[in-house]
From Swiss-Prot:
<dbReference type="InterPro" id="IPR011006">
    <property type="entry name" value="CheY-like_superfamily"/>
</dbReference>
<dbReference type="GO" id="GO:0000325">
    <property type="term" value="C:plant-type vacuole"/>
</dbReference>
<dbReference type="GO" id="GO:0005737">
    <property type="term" value="C:cytoplasm"/>
</dbReference>
<keyword id="KW-0479">Metal-binding</keyword>
<feature type="binding site">
    <location>
        <position position="830"/>
    </location>
    <ligand>
        <name>Mg(2+)</name>
    </ligand>
</feature>
<keyword id="KW-0472">Membrane</keyword>
<dbReference type="InterPro" id="IPR001789">
    <property type="entry name" value="Sig_transdc_resp-reg_receiver"/>
</dbReference>
<keyword id="KW-0808">Transferase</keyword>
<protein>
    <recommendedName>
        <fullName>Histidine kinase 5</fullName>
        <ecNumber>2.7.13.3</ecNumber>
    </recommendedName>
</protein>
<dbReference type="InterPro" id="IPR003661">
    <property type="entry name" value="HisK_dim/P_dom"/>
</dbReference>
<keyword id="KW-0936">Ethylene signaling pathway</keyword>
<dbReference type="InterPro" id="IPR036890">
    <property type="entry name" value="HATPase_C_sf"/>
</dbReference>
<feature type="domain" description="Response regulatory">
    <location>
        <begin position="779"/>
        <end position="921"/>
    </location>
</feature>
<dbReference type="InterPro" id="IPR004358">
    <property type="entry name" value="Sig_transdc_His_kin-like_C"/>
</dbReference>
<dbReference type="GO" id="GO:0005886">
    <property type="term" value="C:plasma membrane"/>
</dbReference>
<dbReference type="GO" id="GO:0004673">
    <property type="term" value="F:protein histidine kinase activity"/>
</dbReference>
<feature type="binding site">
    <location>
        <position position="785"/>
    </location>
    <ligand>
        <name>Mg(2+)</name>
    </ligand>
</feature>
């Protein structure tokens, strides 16, 4: 029994020792961080220590924590306290476990010693030393203590059957097994403790890192708040300040807290700021806005304000957080940048417009160059044809030869007119054509156009001119283009009218409805120089006829290029269909309008309306002889205010195929003559049209001349080698006949010359005069590279009684002028080696300086041989006349700008050459 009780006590002691190793409050004290299952009963193993939850920092919430200093600090404090508590609790638990293990081991060793001691005591073998010699005293004390316990117990008797050696041996073996099991449990527990320590160390690293990040973020936040030039604050739902931070405070904190913006500040922008905050609070959505404040406290400044709503845990809005930053300088810079961008945009737009202008200018220049090239290439060979035909007309020809020659000249004139029409049309469409503004008299222009048309008239028509009294005596406009329009329209009217009347009517009208802002193209400065006022007038011009009329269905396409009323009209009357198209474009270019009304078999009326500037009534043109060729050199009544003209074909029988002569009823004691035209204001006829050539036939005294004046007029033509007499004894000069026949042939008729006058006495006189003049003939230099043009010029000069030297380019011309003295130079513009313009500049430089240094610098070799004589520096200006096939107005201006004195366009005619020689040699 005693042994049984001992066994039970030992087992209870083992359980008690094992149970004491695990305190009952482990789970609660560790805040349930560890779940340790305590051993109970005969459980020999210890379950693993596991971690239910791991505290890991949520990095996504870190920015939210930083938005509020109080929240971040609170979270950080709680986290640190929790971590410290966990660490302290773990250390305490480990210490307790180690303490329990040590106590358990000591108890196990004590039990083992007790058992051994009892075993030795029962076997009476005290001489045997225990396993642990050093603990012999402990065994003796334990044995004595055991005896005392047994004696003081309830005196339970020990049965002898259990007090045997075998029993105690078995008991020792069982205790040894228990000791091994306890040792194994201790080893496993130590391993678990080591693993737990390692796990705790690994778990503590994120907590330390999070703590470090939080401290760093907090330091960064403090750094921003201390250095950023911003204002931060928190306001409740009534927009009263609960917190504010300002780097540069202008008010004390106690003056702000508990108040609204309106209660604190006064001035512009305050109410807007409060309304903006209230709007954000109501909508519950963060927003930002620039607001300019104008207050007495800090003046006018612009702030960028960012406002966000604040919610509690229940999701209710409790106020707002806001941040404000001054952006006044940025706003100013932004406005400057916007202004700069606007200026850059304007500059780019101007550059774009400039590039467009440059492109248009280049296109215009190319168009001009094309027109100049086209004119030059066509007119150059045509000059040879027309010039040679004109020279041939001055020779003795029979009737058939003269008819053929007239057809040749007429065809050449038609080709030239066609070329002029095409060039005019091209110049208008390409924008090359420029209008001139000069003073002229409308009555004289109308009279001149009608006289010219009557001179070549072969039909029984009456030409009328009717100018209203309110038409000004003198106006300003492009007289050459107006004459061109009138000439084309009156020519068409005559062409399609077989009998009846053709006329021109002028009248002043009020400003028409189609007027545009840019209707007037005249230059204001030029008008002021001419003494004009700003008064303008609209003049309506009607060109009417009683001809065949135009079908109504043909009117819409009448002004289109290369279009005629019908194919039958084109075959019967000819023409290219360009005349009306050119007239319409010229009228529109001058700011007017051209219309037509017509009825078949009743006639047509072409009406164009143009604006004109009007001069003062007492400021007439200085040149009272603008159309002196229309009147006799003797004094005549002034007809500048005359308003009605009428011309009838008094020489109609000349153009009839079978008529023998001129009826005395039509031409009593009078005959029609030709004479050169003096153009308005001294202007040379525009080389781009054939106006000057088509108007070569002029009428003296309204188209007639007395017989007494005939011989005098004929005497002015020494170059005429022959004279012819008609049936009535009237005589024509050969040059006059040639010009008249040329005009008549353009209408399809030929002028019949009936007989030749023998004037031997006149020839002898002319021969004597020629011998006298040979000693004083002027020296003329022709600078031309085209052999055909040289041949034509020589022949014309021969007809005019002159000779000339030839130079093929500008270098040869300079060499010739250096070695000889000339009275006149006819200079071609386009030549190889050295063109006419540059040669003229070098000649003018020589006249100014007396040396050829400029020519030498240009590479011209002016060295002379010993036999050549060097001409002295001329005292007078050498006349240099340009001869070119370029018909652009810029070409003539360029010639004048380079020092030339006049301009002759090709094809050169005897009339043009004669006028030039008369102007510069007489």
């Amino acid at each position: 029994m005693v042994c049984e009780m001992e066994t039970d006590q030992i087992e209870e002691m083992d359980v008690e020792v094992l149970s004491s190793m695990w305190p009952e409050d482990v789970g609660t004290e560790a805040d349930k961080q560890f779940n340790v299952e305590k051993p109970a009963g005969d459980l020999d193993t210890l379950k693993e220590v596991t971690i239910e939850t791991r505290t890991i920092a949520d990095m996504t919430r870190l920015p939210n924590l930083l938005n509020s200093t109080h929240q971040g600090s609170s979270q950080l404090t709680n986290l640190v306290k929790q971590w410290e508590y966990m660490q302290d609790n773990a250390v305490r638990l480990l210490k307790e476990e180690l303490k329990n293990l040590d106590r358990q081991r000591e108890e196990a060793e004590a039990k083992e010693l007790k058992i051994i001691e009892e075993y030795k005591f029962e076997s009476n073998e005290p001489e045997n030393v225990p396993v642990l010699d050093e603990t012999s005293d402990l065994f003796r004390r334990f044995r004595q203590k055991k005896r005392d316990a047994l004696v003081d117990s309830k005196k339970i008797e020990i049965y002898e059957e259990f007090d045997t050696v075998a029993y105690w041996k078995q008991k020792a073996l069982s205790l040894e097994k228990m000791l091994e099991a306890s040792t194994e449990r201790e080893r496993r527990l130590m391993e678990k403790l080591s693993e737990s320590l390692k796990t705790m160390e690994s778990q503590s690293a994120p907590v330390q890192e999070l703590t470090q990040n939080l401290k760093r973020a907090e330091g960064f936040l403090h750094f921003i708040l201390q250095n950023a030039p911003i204002v931060m604050g928190h306001q409740d739902k009534d927009l009263r300040y609960l917190f504010i931070y300002n780097k540069y405070p202008s008010l004390r904190e106690q003056d702000i807290l508990g108040k609204t913006d309106v209660e604190i500040f006064h001035g512009g922008g305050v109410k807007e700021s409060e309304d903006f905050k209230r709007e954000v609070l109501e909508k519950g959505k963060a927003s930002k806005r620039e607001i300019t404040f104008t207050t007495d406290l800090f003046g006018s400044k612009t702030f960028l304000i960012y406002v966000e709503p604040v919610y509690n845990k229940a999701g209710e809005k409790i106020g707002i957080n806001y941040m404000g930053m001054e952006v006044t300088d940025q706003v100013v810079k932004r406005e400057k940048m916007a202004k700069l961008r606007e200026d850059n945009a304007v500059r780019k737009a101007m550059e774009s417009e400039l590039n467009k202008t440059i492109h248009i200018t280049e296109e215009t220049m190319r168009a001009k160059q094309m027109l100049a090239t086209m004119s030059h290439e066509i007119r150059s060979p045509l000059s040879g044809v027309v010039g040679m035909a004109e020279i041939l007309s001055t020779t003795k020809l029979d009737k058939e030869q003269r008819q053929l020659l007239n057809v040749m000249i007429s065809s050449g004139d038609l080709v030239l007119q066609l070329i002029n029409d095409i060039l005019d049309l091209s110049k208008v469409e390409s924008g090359v054509m420029r209008l001139e503004a000069t003073k002229f008299r409308p009555r004289e222009v109308v009279k001149h156009v009608l006289q010219t048309a009557a001179a070549s008239l072969k039909k029984s028509l009456t030409l009328e001119g009717n100018i209203a009294d309110d038409v000004p005596i003198e106006v300003v406009g492009d007289v050459l283009r107006i004459r061109q329009i009138l000439t084309n329209l009156i020519s068409n009217a005559i062409k399609f009218t077989h009998e009846g009347n053709v006329g021109i009517k002028l009248q002043v009208i009020s400003e028409p409805s189609f007027v545009r802002d840019n209707a007037l193209n005249a230059d204001t400065e030029e008008h002021e120089q001419n003494g004009l006022t700003e008064t303008s007038v609209w003049i309506c011009c009607d060109v009417w006829d009683t001809g065949i009329g135009i079908p109504e269905n043909a009117l819409p396409c009448l002004f289109k290029k290369y279009m005629q009323a019908s194919a039958d009209h084109a075959r019967k009357y000819g023409g290219t269909g360009l005349g009306l198209a050119i007239c319409k474009q010229l009228v529109e270019l001058m700011g007017g309008q051209l219309t037509v009304t017509s009825r078949v078999s009743e006639g047509s009326t072409f009406t164009f309306i143009l604006p004109y500037k009007v001069g003062r009534s007492d400021d007439y043109s200085d040149d009272q002889d603008e159309f002196s060729d229309m009147a006799d050199q003797q004094s005549e009544p002034d007809d500048t205010a005359e308003g009605y003209f009428q011309f009838k074909p008094l020489l109609g029988s000349i153009y009839s195929n079978g008529g023998p002569g001129i009826s005395n009823d039509f031409l009593p004691h009078k005959v029609m003559l030709t004479s050169p035209i003096k153009l308005i204001n001294g202007f040379v006829a525009d080389p781009s049209n054939n106006t000057g050539q088509s108007e070569m036939l002029q009428l003296e005294n309204g188209g007639y001349m007395d017989e007494s004046k005939l011989e005098t007029s004929s005497g002015h033509c020494p170059e005429s080698a022959h004279q012819y007499e008609n049936g009535n004894g009237r005589c024509f000069s050969k040059e006059s006949e040639s010009c008249s026949s040329s005009q008549a042939s353009s209408e399809g008729g030929t002028l019949e010359m009936e007989s030749e006058l023998t004037v031997s006495s006149h020839r002898e006189e002319e021969k004597a005069e020629t011998e006298v003049k040979e000693t004083s003939k002027p020296k003329i230099l022709l600078v031309e590279d085209n052999k055909i043009n040289i041949m034509v010029a020589k022949s014309m000069m021969k007809q005019l009684g002159h000779t000339m030297d030839i130079a093929n380019n500008g270098v040869e011309a300079i060499t010739a002028i250096n070695s000889s003295s000339y009275d006149l130079v006819l200079m071609d513009v386009c030549m190889p080696v050295l063109d006419g313009l540059k040669a003229t500049r070098l000649i003018r430089s020589y006249e100014e300086t007396g040396n050829w240094n400029a020519a030498i610098e240009a590479g011209v070799d002016i060295s002379t041989s010993e036999n050549e004589q060097v001409c002295m520096r001329p005292t007078n200006r050498l006349p240099i006349i340009a001869m070119t096939a370029n018909t652009l107005a810029e070409s003539s201006e360029e010639c004048y700008a380079n020092g030339m004195d006049s301009f002759i366009s090709k094809p050169v005619t005897l009339q043009k050459l004669r006028e030039c020689l008369q102007q510069y040699l007489h």
